[in-house]
């Protein structure tokens, strides 16, 4: 047997509505109890006033007659006195189970010896309200009223019944209004959630163009903004993945096509299998190997899988070693390699990965700088940051191209292209290495007409404190 399981809208509605019902019923009973107690106190106060009036009136009559004979067997006389100041209640009919004269169950008139002159035959309650009848300061009798523990007069009972019915009617109307308000409130509060749920389903189905419109500035509005950011990131990653696969296919196609052409030429007898042919094939295989290695390094750096063994590292000897390894290659192309370095700058990092960073930057300038140019490497520190600058000479790039230099497989047109032999992954790997060291890498126009790559890294003491 399946039971109804409410959704989040139903649960929110039930929670708010149940709270409203509990509050309404609690308030109703609190008001009822307060009303009944207050009403009984009001009746008690009225009885006390009637007792006092009756006591004063009987005292005047006693002073005129000098005794209580006028009152014996004359209950109607007391009734007439009460009727004189209680016109509204004089026509009331006795309640159920009460004698014809309902007032007799409430009042007794006794003389100075506590002998009952007027009143019911029932015993006088010891906790009744007593008002003495005074004549010239002497007590000649008393008027006694039974304690009020419940409503006995029809007027009071009917009034209490009417108030009870009215209060329940108010509770019923308030319940309907609470249900309507709760329903509208639940729908209003959960409408953004429903839009987010629908958007999530679309994202799960692969529609990364889905966006939701934030309708408030609260937590749900912030969640909608985060959802849109997530969708935008997924859409961007999807496009990058497509471009990445297309770029890989393109990069692999050229060396494979050359290899295939060379092998088919040898197979058809067009070319002879000579050492020169073997060298050509090895060059293409080397290109493929370099591309695969770069892809492997990039994928590991993307996932943070590169093993970073961080320790205090002096960058100056590291730069000098890297520059020394490239000096002969720079000279063979007619390029000048110049350094402007301080004696020592220490950072907290991985020596091997920093060497890989410098090698990639040197390789980038070597491949893409025109012959007869130069590369200026400078270093310094400002505040708590180490700044390394690799500024080469022409050719330069446009402002738009500067923003794309660190994208994988990106190459500029002109002399900075595939003809130079690069895979377009070196600067992307540099970006990952720098970010792994809590730094940043920036491309700008070089004062020498080429490109200036600036690497900013935290000083050794700041990074070590963070670790």
Swiss-Prot record:
GO terms for molecular function: ATP binding; phosphorelay sensor kinase activity. It catalyses: ATP + protein L-histidine = ADP + protein N-phospho-L-histidine. Residues 187-239 form the HAMP domain. The keyword Cell membrane applies. Autophosphorylated. The keyword ATP-binding applies. Its EC number is 2.7.13.3. It is an enzyme of class 2 (transferase). Residues 1-11, 187-467 are cytoplasmic. GO terms for cellular component: membrane; plasma membrane. NCBIfam families: BaeS_SmeS, PRK10549.1. The modification Phosphohistidine is found at residue 250. Keywords: ATP-binding, Cell inner membrane, Cell membrane, Kinase, Membrane, Nucleotide-binding, Phosphoprotein, Stress response, Transferase, Transmembrane, Transmembrane helix, Two-component regulatory system. This is Signal transduction histidine-protein kinase BaeS. It is a multi-pass membrane protein. The chain crosses the membrane at residues 12-32, 168-186. Disruption phenotype: Loss of induction of the CRISPR-Cas casABCDE-ygbT-ygbF operon.
